[in-house]
């Protein structure tokens, strides 16, 4: 698998478990002999939802909720077969969404 690149994109609502997962991936890839670039922090998406506090009237009284999606990018350059095998066996938290591109 020479001259290839694996791009891993991580998404999560909690930045702490996201950073822990990224550190696990980087550590696993480095131990198996691959070159690693990252984790690179990508812009955080912020979704804001505004709702009325009252049911019928009082339109001026509103409440806002927000949902932040944190993202990280990891590039693994020149992965070995051991790298791919180790990444497949890696156990990550359920709150982290992983997208892998070869």
From Swiss-Prot:
It comes from the Bacteria. InterPro entries: Ribosomal_uS10, Ribosomal_uS10_CS, Ribosomal_uS10_dom, Ribosomal_uS10_dom_sf. PROSITE patterns: RIBOSOMAL_S10. One of its GO terms (cellular component) is ribonucleoprotein complex. GO terms for molecular function: structural constituent of ribosome; tRNA binding. The keyword Cell cycle does not apply. SUPFAM superfamilies: Ribosomal protein S10. Involved in the binding of tRNA to the ribosomes. Belongs to the universal ribosomal protein uS10 family. This is Small ribosomal subunit protein uS10. It comes from Brevibacillus brevis (strain 47 / JCM 6285 / NBRC 100599). The lineage of its organism: Bacteria, Bacillati, Bacillota, Bacilli, Bacillales.
